[in-house]
Amino acid sequence: NDENKNLIEVVLIPSKSHNTICVSVQVGCAMSKSSACIHCATGTQLLVKNLSASEIVMQMMIAKRYLNDFGDQRLIKNCVIMGSGESLTNYENVKEFIKILMEQEGIHMGKKSITLSTIGIPDKIKKFADEVGVYLALSLHSGDNAKRNKIIPINKKYPLKEVIESCKYY
């Protein structure tokens, strides 16, 4: 929960040797209303707020404390930014969070251990490639524009061709 009692989703994904954390970047989703992805429960929730970089980092700290409390010695070695919210609509805070993740004096996670997921906002994908450059996961849902328009209405604004071109740039 944040200071206003908003629930913030964070997920730990265990494997034999380590844990992966899935963090959220928003309470609700900027793609809600007319742009909501039809399959996504978060898309039914109006955007309450973008999470700050420190609120995203706090998810990592809470997860580490949880693991310690339960005696889990496996480290959190990977971070996937694909919880609640569209990552690229909270660009600056997500970029700052990733910078903190990679700081040697901080969490010290390598670029190859971090993946950002997006439904595809072409200009932000290109900017992210130039400024950040961690792994990128595209929620494609369909290679057909007509089908994708129904599943992810934002596709009408950012058609598949533009999204794919931005991914090639990436």
Predicted regions and their residues:
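Short, flexible active-site-adjacent loop segments at beta-strand->alpha-helix junctions, enriched
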Residues: 3, 14-16, 27, 85, ...
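N-terminal [4Fe-4S]-dependent radical SAM core
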Residues: 1-25, 60-73
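Short, low-complexity, polar/charged sequence segments that are solvent-exposed and flexible
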Residues: 5, 17-20, 28-32, 45-46, ...
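Canonical Radical SAM [4Fe-4S] cluster-binding loop centered on the CxxxCxxC motif
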Residues: 14-58
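Short acidic, gly/pro-rich beta-turn/loop elements at beta-sheet edges
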Residues: 8-9, 18-21, 33-35, 89, ...
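Conserved alpha-helical substructure of the radical SAM core
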Residues: 44-78
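Conserved AdoMet/S-adenosylmethionine-binding subsite of the radical SAM
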Residues: 65-170
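Surface-exposed beta-strand edges and their flanking turn/coil or helix-capping segments
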Residues: 11-13, 22-25, 52-55, 129-131, ...
